[in-house]
Design a protein with these regions (language model features):
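Membrane transport/envelope proteins' first extracytoplasmic loop
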Residues: 2-23, 27-277
Length: 277
């Protein structure tokens, strides 16, 4: 019976070779397409994880209702499982760029660490400083040398693109400008891409304007008023860089650190960023 069946199969193929080849090719294409879809997701995750590691992207972001102080930063540094901590200041403001008013988020930047980093390949921010977290990549121009200079988003979609040499002037905010900024005018020295602002179409929400941040800028810590507190702290977790993001191994490390903060320490709110370390 098996011989008869095999003989009939051979006859069916030889009588309609064209149809058989067409079905075989369609099946092969379908299998190849499906395999490609499966591999695309894996390859994208691997590429993203390599980028996160190359820019020392934070695993957690710690915030406080009234901001953070040096005592809070010291407490965070002593939490078991914390690899490194970088306190940061962020503030949204109305700023004039090319005679147009936009909502710009100003971020503090360790200028020495930035200048000592190597971003020449456009994908990595090589630095020996573990506390230099969420390292921007310089696309054009140079890093700021002082409080009167800044680098801005290379991918911001504005009516007129920002260029090296342009001037940004802060003209307003949610309160008195002097309570937040010690300086309100900056010369753009470079354009950057930041792992903290991955979505080029959306840099975050704001209480100002239409509710969206139009662009971001990195400025010297001295830009802010003397009494302006840290608005948060970027944290990297021990062992997170060795895990692929996203993965169960990575999530367990980040979740354990958040749980440890909640149950063992009286610290400000701690939120996973959803990005690898």
């Amino acid at each position: 019976m098996a011989r008869a069946f095999n003989k009939e199969v051979r006859r069916s193929i030889t009588r309609s070779v064209g149809r058989f080849l067409a079905i075989a090719i369609i099946s092969a294409l379908g299998c190849g397409f499906f395999a490609g879809l499966l591999m695309t997701s894996i390859d994208m995750n691997i590429s993203a994880d390599e980028f996160y590691d190359a820019t020392n992207t934070s695993d957690l972001y710690v915030t406080g209702t009234l901001g953070l102080d040096d005592a809070d930063i010291d407490a965070i540094e002593h939490v078991e499982g914390v690899r490194s901590v970088e306190p940061v200041r962020m503030a949204d403001a109305y700023a004039i760029l090319a005679d147009e008013k936009y909502v710009v988020r100003f971020n503090s930047l360790d200028l020495d660490a930035a200048r000592n980093s190597d971003t020449s390949d456009g994908m990595h921010a090589i630095s020996d400083d573990e506390e230099y977290i969420n390292r921007p990549i310089l696309v054009e121009g140079s890093w700021p040398t002082g409080p009167g200079e800044c680098v801005v988003a290379a991918d911001a979609v504005l009516d007129e693109p920002m260029q090296v040499g342009d001037v940004i002037e802060i003209v307003g905010g949610s309160g008195d400008i002097a309570d937040t900024f010690a300086r309100t005018q900056f010369v753009i020295t470079g354009l950057v891409r930041s792992p903290y602002y991955l979505m080029t179409s959306n840099f975050g929400s704001s209480e100002l304007g239409s509710g969206d941040v139009d662009s971001y800028a990195f400025v010297a810590p001295e830009t802010y008023a003397e009494d302006f507190p840290y608005t948060g702290a970027f944290v990297t977790a021990t062992g997170a860089a060795d895990e692929l993001y996203p993965s169960d191994g990575y999530d367990s490390i980040a979740d354990a650190l958040v749980a440890r903060r909640e149950h063992e320490f009286r610290l400000p709110d701690c939120t996973p960023l959803g990005s690898a370390g």
